[in-house]
Amino acid sequence: MKAKKLPVLNDPIYGFIGIDSGIIFELLSHPFFQRLRRISQMGLSYLVYPGARHSRFEHALGAMHLMNKAVMVLRKKGIEISKAEKEALSIAILLHDIGHGPFSHALEECILIDTHHEALSLGYMELLNEQFDGKLSLAIQIFNGQYPRKFMGQLVASQLDIDRLDYLKRDSFYTGATEGNINTQRIIEMFFVVDDELVVEEKGLFSVEKFIMARRLMYWQVYLHKTGVAAELLLLSLIHI
């Protein structure tokens, strides 16, 4: 029987993104994940930046692509990462935002009080794990920060994680705010693991400093723009009427 050919997707930021396992393709095709096509990455920011109409779907794919790059770099430097761990890392980052609702963060605390999207993402992942006969168990451990190899959880969620590396570059591209255009490849190439912690080589410190400044400037200029914030407040007031 001929093996099923997995797709290659074209992304405006990174070029071609390969899908390298059957379960990743099945998760991409699942209705839970497909709904992210209709979830704005930047909420109401398109009212200020007309190009900012990209979705959580695109961001998740981009983050998965960067995760695969990070695994490749760490393996090249002698860090052992099994095939199962690589697949689990891809799944964890692919599904990290699956719990986002309409308008992304704008309605996060309005529809479900005291429930953040991370908790909803975990709920979706647990439902998917049941449907996929436990094949997401390792990914859930990594997502929860419960996996013994601490650096894997840090790749998914930390101060310098794959999520932030993608959204800064992607949001910069679609808004035209060049302050967020960080060198993701350079930062990933500087990744290393010491005492089971994710670290950056000394020669990569300048790139990390630029990343920190880029994030600060993007919040100041884009994410917390007064018009976008005002639009979110109006939306919340309409819901509360």
Regions found by a protein language model. Name each.
Residues 1-38:
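Non-catalytic interface/linker regions that flank or bridge core catalytic/transmembrane domains
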Residues 20, 27, 35-58, 108, ...:
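Active-site flanking loop/helix segments enriched in acidic
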Residues 42-44, 48-88:
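Alpha-helical phosphate/pyrophosphate-handling elements in metalloenzyme active cores
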Residues 62-68, 116-129:
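An active-site-proximal "capping" alpha-helix that borders the catalytic cofactor pocket
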Residues 63, 85-105, 121, 235:
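His-Asp-centered metal-binding catalytic motifs of divalent-metal-dependent phosphohydrolases/nucleases
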Residues 79-93, 138-145, 151:
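Alpha-helical scaffolds flanking conserved acidic
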Residues 127-217, 224-227:
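Histidine/acidic-rich helix-loop-helix segments that form or flank divalent-metal centers
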Residues 239-241:
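Conserved small/polar residues in nucleotide/adenosyl-binding loops
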